[in-house]
């Protein structure tokens, strides 16, 4: 969401953007917790609670899941203010998706339970730039770059980058 927010507000100089598992629409946090976060954000913005997101929903690779669980920098807590800002940013992005002017590549796993793929699909449909591409990976979980099909994901990513870096290079060279 951060890269989209930036690209919509400051598109100058960007050659394109790539997003994976865009958290638009339904996410793996219960609606009750999101409403509670919104209410508490006004009076106790630093209040935090467990989001309830299951750490095994990131990847189908057991080694990756185990490493994520052991990583002291990964956690499943969120603050009340995070919930409020997340929802506000998501709504703003949906409203302004049509204004995205740079090449756009969105990737999502169709089995993602953290950020449901329908949200990515809906956002993609609102984007009007002619240079846009959406790729959904069958069985893919939330963390596509660390899922069992990461080679397939990386191949699509490299192909998109090669096509866009080449066209960007030719565009700049023609101006010289």
Where are these regions (language model features)?
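Conserved hydrolase catalytic core segment
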Residues: 1-19, 25
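Hydrophobic/aromatic beta-strand patches that form the interior of the parallel beta-sheet core
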Residues: 18, 105-107, 135
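Helix-rich cap/lid subdomain of alpha/beta-hydrolase
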Residues: 27-69
């Amino acid at each position: 969401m951060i890269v989209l927010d930036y690209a919509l507000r400051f598109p100058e100089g960007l050659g394109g953007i790539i997003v994976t598992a865009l958290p638009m629409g339904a996410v793996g946090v219960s609606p009750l917790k999101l409403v509670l976060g919104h209410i508490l954000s006004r009076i106790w913005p630093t209040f935090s609670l467990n989001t309830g997101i299951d750490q095994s929903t990131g990847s189908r690779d057991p080694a990756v899941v185990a490493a994520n669980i052991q990583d002291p920098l990964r956690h499943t807590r969120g603050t009340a203010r995070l919930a409020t800002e997340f929802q506000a940013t998501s709504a703003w992005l949906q409203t302004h998706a049509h204004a995205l002017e740079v090449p756009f590549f969105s990737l999502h796993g169709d089995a993602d339970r953290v950020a449901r793929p329908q949200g990515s699909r809906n956002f993609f449909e609102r984007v009007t730039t002619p240079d846009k591409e959406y790729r959904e990976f069958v069985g893919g979980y939330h963390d596509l770059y660390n899922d069992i099909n990461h080679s397939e994901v990386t191949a699509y990513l490299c192909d998109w980058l090669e096509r866009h870096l080449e066209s960007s290079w030719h565009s700049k060279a023609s101006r010289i």
